[in-house]
Amino acid sequence: MTPVQVPNLDVSVTSSLITTAPVTGNAATISTFTPGSPEPSMNGEEKESSYFPISENDDGTLDLFGDSELEKEQKGDNQETDYSSQYLHPTPPYTNFDDESPSSPTHPSVSNITVDGDSKKHSLQLQEEEKSSESLDSHTHPPKRVRNEDDSLTFSKTSPVSPSSLKDGASNTVTNDASNKIKSEASESASPSALQALDSTAAGSSKEHSSPHDETVKKEENDKDQYPPMTKEQHKYIHAMLRQLRRGRDSIPFRAPVDPVKQNIPDYPTIIKNPIDLGTMQKKFSSGVYSSAQHFIDDMNLMFSNCFLYNGTESPVGVMGKNLQATFERQLKQLPSAYVTSYSRPGRRPRSMTAPKGGARTRRQAAMYSNSSSGIRETMYDLKPHRRKDAAEMKFCQSVLKELLKKQHEAYAYPFYKPVNPTACGCPDYFKVIKHPMDLGTMQNKLNHNEYASMKAFEADMVLMFKNCYKFNSAGTPVHLMGKKLESIFQKLWANKPDFDSETYMGMSSVNTDYYYGDNEVFDSGDEFLEDDGEEFEAVNRQIHKLQSTLQAMKSRARSSSVSRRSRSRSLSVDIYPPITYEMQNELAEQCNYLSADQLSHVAEILRAALPHLRNTDEIEIDVSAMPPDVFYKVYYYVCKGDEIGAEALATASHTHQEKKKGRALSETEQAEKIRQLRAQLDRFSGIAQNKNTVTGNIAAYNTKSLGSDDSSSEDDGESSESSDSA
């Protein structure tokens, strides 16, 4: 093999680039130098250690890359050293591509140089990526020489993709370049449908390489939206639970934010990135930041995680954190469900404001006076929600259950906290023996969901639970003895239940349920009237009797001004307090946490004296929003102002202001005129009802008693009423 002379050009082939340069002489030598060998001398002397000749193929063309030698060696015809492998796996030094650009001009005489060998066409292609500030230099990431399927060589410079380049959509660079290359190669022979498929593939790949940060943010937003909103029951329970947690001794390190300067822990902000405490959670809860109960639970878990991360679990603060976490998890089991069916009071049936067809003004008889429809009426009453009486009963049941769930009874009450798990307890035949299981947790859930219709239903479930215990566990076993102990506690608590007055309940029910479904109608006629089974008559009659009694008292013996004022204040006045604001309730609840033992005892005495149902209880827990105004202001002035007498002074001042607003009392003449107007109104109702024959038996009896005769005309109503009044 002999060197080949090419006129006017000096072509040198390195492991990474072929360069050309014009020369002044008549001929030039095509030479190469091997990586790792000394560079060729500049004085024109050739060294065998630095050069090896470029051979010719059988057809006389140049073999720049040693393909013919490689083929001969594979066939066993040539035993010389193979130099082509040094090109396929280059080693430093390399040529730097940073000074070049794809748009830089090339020499006109070598712009389209091709070398043919072995009847195959070899193309030399220079390819480089865009310069990037984040890419490494060419010495650490050199260009690579790759042989393609069409036997062409490609020099490419690669650089790793840094994590920062994944932001702002930079991750699509490699994918887009590859898709554009495939698309350009396929555009020559592919159909339009194939090109459309390539476009869709590229679009899909760009979506797959979307920013991971954006996907994380979207996932967090979706998780945040999927939590159910906090219900009223959950809000009340979490408020009480948070107050109870802050009241315990183990919560002392967690009541306020950590002060690194004051506590001399400068590394705390470095270790704990998201600090949280009970005081901050109380503020967030009061301002309505927690839209879901899960958000509150997440903050509580974050507080415990921060504690264990910085203090460990064996330090004093870590032990207090574990105790507080155990209390929180135990209370969290009783959290009401987020999916609670709301019980709403059925509204009134809309009254008809138009006359019936045919102009006939008829009125349905009240169902309460009809024996035939009594069953329907009772059914309609059964559909109504329970009134205040039932609420008081359920509150007592809740207090009994709360007492049984206290920690002091845990030693013998824990088997009844949750439903029996036959697998965990090792009693697979439990449900074969016990057909209707019951436990305290199920009863608590039923109370929270208003599933008990009365106290008897609650008591029946409690008796059922103990009955199941004695049925499955024979006498003398530990669980049987625990059930006996817990049942004795329940019997003592149940024996102290208040005596709910049935007559009071019936009176409240009748007041709240009368005319609930609107049995009367208003007719569109010249003489409109509203008739609700005589209630208007009774109201007018009560006003008449009230004014008559006042008038009779004025005509009686004269009393002194001081005595009369005192009697009027006793009979007509009540202590009126200003409205209780939400800020006052929060202030009272906060200040109660910092009272001493003596102050708490005095507050308990105030509550027991004002609320009889708390007199026999050892521990008092009352909702601030449910306290009567007089009791609230007594406790509020004592706890927040330090002056218990201020509440009475406030009530007196409010009453005096109210009396001034009422104005002067009516004189005898004015009261007589008021009585006359009320009687005229009563006579008008009575006359219309008699003329239309639509008055029920009770109203007719009332007219007979008050007017004397049902046959009197409307013109004589005034005289008949006067005669009946004089009689």
UniProtKB/Swiss-Prot annotation:
Q: Where in the cell?
A: Nucleus
Polar residues: which segments have biased composition? 102-114, 153-177
Q: Which GO terms describe its biological process?
A: chromatin remodeling; DNA repair-dependent chromatin remodeling; heterochromatin boundary formation
Q: Where is the Bromo domain?
A: 229-335, 388-497
User: CDD domains, from UniProt?
Assistant: Bromo_BDF1_2_I (cd05500), Bromo_Brdt_II_like (cd05498)
- Chain positions with Phosphoserine modification: S162
Q: Under what name is this protein listed?
A: Bromodomain-containing protein C631.02
Q: Name one GO cellular component term.
A: chromatin
Bias kind Acidic residues: ranges: 56-68, 712-727
Mitochondrion keyword on record: no
Q: PROSITE patterns attached here?
A: BROMODOMAIN_1, BROMODOMAIN_2, NET
Q: Which domain of life is it from?
A: Eukaryota
Q: Which UniProt keywords apply?
A: Bromodomain, Nucleus, Phosphoprotein, Repeat
Indicate the segments forming the NET domain, all copies.
570-650
> Where in the sequence does UniProt note compositional bias of the Basic and acidic residues kind?
69-78, 128-150, 206-231
- What does the sequence similarity comment in the record state about its family? Belongs to the BET family.
GO MF terms listed in the record are: histone binding; lysine-acetylated histone binding
Residues of the region (Disordered) are 27-231, 341-369, 699-727
Which organism is the protein's source? Schizosaccharomyces pombe (strain 972 / ATCC 24843) (Fission yeast)
Q: Which Gene3D superfamilies match?
A: 1.20.1270.220, Bromodomain-like
